[in-house]
Regions:
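Short, Lys/Arg-rich, polar N-terminal cytosolic tail immediately upstream
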Residues: 1-11
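Transmembrane helix boundary and interhelical junction motifs in multipass membrane proteins
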Residues: 166-171, 363-368, 379-381, 452, ...
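Transmembrane alpha-helices of multi-pass inner-membrane enzymes
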Residues: 230-234, 447-484, 488
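TM-adjacent membrane-interface loops and short helices in multi-pass inner/ER membrane proteins
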Residues: 330-384, 392-396
């Protein structure tokens, strides 16, 4: 009797507005999969042999899975978070060992007629675990050891997924660091992340250009200069020590200018070596002063300079030696280094044509020529948004993005109204994952971000991604419903 009353209480406390948005997006997504995978020879959209038929099964099982998750109390996740996390870590390791290679990656485990991608399910495990850890008494991100624990929980599955050669899925886990910012992580960490992106983009974009007639790579020169400027600026912002800031600026920037003039008018040489030496001397100075004056902020600034330099050379090595050819080429196309629209840029170019051909109102359901004639590769998975653009036009695309925007703001509302840290952190984890997927997927279809192969939530064809997103959302809905039950 109590169980029935409890279930009725959960149903009454559920956020049905969010569930309605979920059902709208899932249904809309299925029609888009129908449009993207429709075959004139085999027009049956409900058959198991078609992607639309399979997706209908995934949707049905996802709804059943979500309904079952609503019956599990929050305390189960609280007590089992670490066990779930370790189970997913073991599954990721097993995937590396036994998974067959599919399209260059080893991330799919075949189970009978279907394949599952553990990387999609590891997201909710990480979200639960960091929520559990950050909810412990006395936890603070200001504590270096505790921050390192959270970072390790995020980076471990990320590294395992990279070992599966699934770089796109691994990058999604970086979105968890945005959650930490909401929980009090200093903005310096976000600035460091921004700086790393700038180093990578500038270093790669200008890696083949020389500075005038000197043996100097423009990308390397600019990155070293940026490291100097950022480090000096941080010294002033965090210490307000004008004398130290001025000394570092005159020494580092001054030596760079002198080396540039000497190389231009006397003997040409690679002035990046001088920049590296100057930045190293600056870093050593900061470390020495940190110990002598017992100023922890100087240690952090020195660490920033070390990480910046290390990241630049490491990312350069990874780009040229570790990334697969198709991954490297996609980045080159995005940065304008490679404009081969017949090969590297073919996917994005065809997606743009499909979206542009839709016009204002679109061509109508199942009437898209670009998608029906299979001009757009992966049109029912990674490039599903171009089907919306072609069949439903600008109005349909704008309506979809508006629906996602409402969904995102609703997640913010759910996260903010949680009474404890665990619920709030989990809510923001779900939010950041959805936001990252939405921004990157739509961005790569429009040619604004690299093509890294991540699905559009609730839209892209595939059971693993749909189940993974459903698990993330419905656990949050149960946690939120329990908040209402306690209030009653």
């Amino acid at each position: 009797m109590r169980s029935n009353e409890g279930n009725k209480g959960v149903l009454a406390s559920l956020d049905w507005f969010t569930i309605s948005l979920y059902l709208i997006l899932v249904t809309w997504g299925w029609f888009s999969v129908c449009g993207a995978s429709y075959d004139f020879i085999n027009p049956d959209i409900f058959g198991w042999s078609t992607n639309s038929g399979k997706q209908l099964v995934w949707i049905g099982t996802a709804i059943i899975l979500g309904s079952m998750l609503l019956l599990i109390e929050k305390r189960f996740y609280d007590t089992s978070a670490y066990f779930i996390y370790m189970t997913m870590i073991m599954l990721l390791i097993v995937t590396i060992i036994i998974a067959p290679e599919t399209k260059g990656s080893k991330s799919w485990i075949p189970i009978g007629p279907v394949k599952l991608q553990p990387a999609e399910f590891a997201k909710f495990a990480v979200a639960l675990t960091i929520s559990k850890l950050m909810n412990t008494y006395g936890f603070t991100l200001a504590n270096t050891r505790q921050f390192a624990q959270v970072a390790a929980l995020i980076l471990l599955p990320m590294l395992l997924i990279i070992c599966q050669k699934e770089t796109g899925s691994a990058l999604v886990y970086l979105s968890f660091f945005l959650v930490l910012y909401r929980e009090g992580m200093t903005g310096a960490f976000l600035f460091t992340g921004f700086a790393m992106i700038v180093y990578f983009v500038v270093g790669i974009r200008f890696s083949t250009e020389q500075l005038s007639y000197m043996p100097v790579i423009v990308g390397e020169f600019i990155v070293h200069l940026l490291i100097s400027i950022f480090t000096i600026a941080m010294t002033w912002v965090y210490t307000r020590n004008w004398q130290l800031t001025r000394t570092l600026a005159l020494t580092v920037i001054g030596s760079t200018i002198l080396a540039l003039l000497f190389s231009a008018y006397v003997i040409p040489f690679n002035i990046c070596h001088v920049q590296l030496i100057a930045n190293t001397a600056m870093t050593i100075t900061l470390i020495v002063m940190a110990f002598t004056t017992r100023t922890a902020k100087l240690t952090f600034i020195a660490l920033f300079a070390i990480i910046s330099t290390s990241f630049f050379y490491a990312s350069n090595h990874v780009f040229h030696k570790v990334l697969q050819d198709h991954q490297r080429t996609r980045i080159e196309v995005l940065l304008g280094i490679n404009d081969d629209i017949r090969r590297a840029g073919y996917n994005v170019n065809q997606a743009k044509i499909a979206i542009g051909s839709g016009g204002l109102t679109g061509k109508g359901f199942l009437n898209g020529t670009q998608t029906k004639l299979k001009y757009v590769p992966e049109q029912d998975t990674d490039f599903i948004f171009c089907t919306v653009g072609e069949e439903e036009g600008f109005i349909g695309s704008a309506a979809l993005l508006l629906t996602y925007l409402v969904f995102i703001f609703r997640l913010i509302h759910l996260a903010e109204r949680q009474p404890d840290t665990m619920g709030r952190v989990y809510g923001y984890s779900v939010l950041c994952i959805f936001l990252f997927h939405l921004f990157i997927n739509v961005g790569m279809v429009l040619g604004l971000t690299p093509v890294i192969g991540i699905p559009l939530p609730f839209f892209s064809y595939g059971g693993s991604s749909l189940w993974g997103f459903t698990i993330l959302l419905f656990i949050l809905l149960r946690i939120d419903a329990e908040r209402n039950l306690k209030r009653q």
